[in-house]
Amino acid sequence: MQYTQQAAAVTAEVNKAVQGKQQTVNTIWMAMLAGGHVLIEDIPGVGKTTLALAFARALDLKESRVQFTPDVLPSDLVGFSVYQKETGKFVYHAGAVMCNLFLGDEINRTSSRTQSALLEVMEEGTVTVDGVTRPVPAPFTVIATQNPIGAAGTQMLPQSQLDRFMVCAVMGYPD
């Protein structure tokens, strides 16, 4: 019973941020409970990002958000190593995916090279930088938003990436 009450409390909290989208909220919540990733597709301005951030706040998760543009690099997502002259060693600087809930906003506006940086982390829960594999924090969920194909500056996601999303939710206009 306790889990049911906790799930209802999360749903109620998310519904405060985005009203009238109970089916979408339930779909996303079930995917997250199952350990899956979520793709939210719809036109700009219907609350895709607000909904994703509401889940992060309701669940008190460490979140990270990247607004995908053509100039976002794979290293922005997975991190990079920097040589420290003083110690003579490379030091890893974590990327945006080192969190519990990663929000990839408008994922279909970035290069396919950057999109592919998400493949390992979505499938295996790890990132590999300079030959060193590191786990991301658990639990880990990607909620990505995308605008409809054909909108200015968008491109189709590759099938290999679409396969890593458990569900594709649609927001629709606010009620």
Name what the model sees in each region:
Residues I43, L77, T145:
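P-loop (Walker A) phosphate-binding loop of NTP-binding proteins
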Residues V38, F102, F140:
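Conserved beta-strand position immediately N-terminal to the Walker
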Residues D42, D105-E106, A117:
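Walker B catalytic acidic pair
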Residues L53-Y83, T87-G88, H93:
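Conserved P-loop/Walker A NTP-binding site and adjacent catalytic elements of P-loop NTPases
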Residues Q2-V46:
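Pre-Walker A (pre-P-loop) alpha-helix and adjacent loop at the N terminus of AAA/AAA+ ATPase modules
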Residues Q84-K89, R109-T114, M122-D175:
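Canonical AAA+ ATPase core
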Residues W29-P70:
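Walker A/P-loop
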Residues T27-M30, Y83-G104:
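Conserved alpha-helical scaffold flanking the Walker A/P-loop in AAA+ ATPase domains
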